[in-house]
Amino acid sequence: GLTLTTEDFKILAQRPFDICIGAIAQYLIMPFLAFALTKALNLPDGIALGLILVGCCPGGVSSNIMSYLCGGDVAFSVGMTTVSTLLSPVMTPLMVSLLASGTHISIKGLPMFVSIIETVIFPVAVGFLLNYLLGKNKTFKELQKIMPGIAVLGLACVVGGVVSSQGSKFFESGVVIFVAVFLHNGLGYLLGYGAGKLTGMNT
């Protein structure tokens, strides 16, 4: 949110067709691919739900970084990240409820919707507003430079905490999780590229 500017929203008006195709692909390819892998690999309910949840989440900043490193269309990637994030309070609970209904884990859409608003949309909105109001402030610009590092450190702490608290279970299923995530990401890249190719995008 702190790096989001009004310029990032211009692509939505300039390339609405591409953005629509990207949003549709985001919430069709990754969720249904995750669902297919849970069935193909016969994953336990807990791991299956986790993979489906990942598949139903919006594209994050990492997609923008990968686009940059691979020489892709970074502006389009940022636009897609923005749209998929704005759609996530509705699409993520909806898709998870639909695809994870076969597990023995209770899925509650409304609490998930509220949680996404609180943890994703609200912080992004506050960051965008601060950037809009204070973007030219020297101190704020210095803060912007260090925030990505702080965010990565915070994420590492969260992941480390989860892994350490579930260490035995994680290592018991480590190979299965690795294979599932590798296939999900690899096939997601291929299918996403194919969707762009089929719709005439510059690939």
Cite the ranges covered by each PLM segment.
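Alpha-helical transmembrane segments of multi-pass small-molecule/ion transporters
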Residues: L2-T203
